[in-house]
């Protein structure tokens, strides 16, 4: 279902698991290549515009979400995590109070959980990461007794 610039899937998961994706509309970025709702400071957009776009997201989301620093690789990180920077292309958590967040442009966002909602994972799947096994790596980390 599409509501403004937020898209939510219609999937059968526990009520406390939420997934949303933004589109490129209704934002503050004025350069046409960003299509107005850019959320990344890594692509040459005006930082003020990105901050205004981010404020829109934060006004509709819990305070406890973290962006990872993506690099088109295969690294997976468990949240919450105090290391900085959080360099990975996937994150997961077993904590119901933590939000897994990724950014995508032309890459595939993958969100996975189980029918109990015992974990959630957000995977940034570009062609490089797919070739390096980012999905398999995320599933293996989630299933590992010592992540």
Functional labels for PLM-detected ranges:
Residues 3, 9, 44-48, 55, ...:
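One-carbon transfer enzymes
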Residues 16-55:
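Intrinsically disordered, low-complexity, positively charged segments
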Residues 27, 59-62, 144-147:
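Generic secondary-structure signature for well-ordered alpha-helical cores
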Residues 30-31, 76-77, 129-132:
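Short acidic/glycine-rich loop or secondary-structure boundary segments that cap or lie
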Residues 47-125:
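Phosphate-centric recognition/catalysis
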Residues 111-147:
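Glycine- and Gly-Pro-enriched alpha-helical subdomains that act as flexible
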């Amino acid at each position: 279902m599409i509501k403004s610039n937020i898209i939510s899937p219609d999937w059968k998961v526990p009520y406390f698991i939420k997934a949303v994706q933004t589109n490129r509309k209704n934002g503050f970025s004025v350069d046409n290549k960003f299509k107005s709702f850019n959320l990344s400071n890594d692509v040459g957009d005006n930082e003020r515009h990105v901050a205004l776009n981010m404020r829109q997201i934060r006004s509709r989301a819990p305070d406890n979400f973290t962006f990872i620093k993506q690099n088109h690789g295969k690294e997976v990180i468990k949240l919450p995590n105090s290391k900085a920077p959080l360099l990975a292309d996937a994150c997961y958590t077993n904590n119901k109070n933590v939000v897994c967040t990724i950014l995508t442009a032309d890459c595939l966002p993958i969100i996975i959980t189980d029918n109990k909602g015992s974990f959630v994972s957000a995977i940034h799947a570009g062609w490089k990461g797919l070739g390096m096994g980012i999905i398999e790596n995320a599933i293996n980390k989630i299933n590992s007794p010592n992540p």
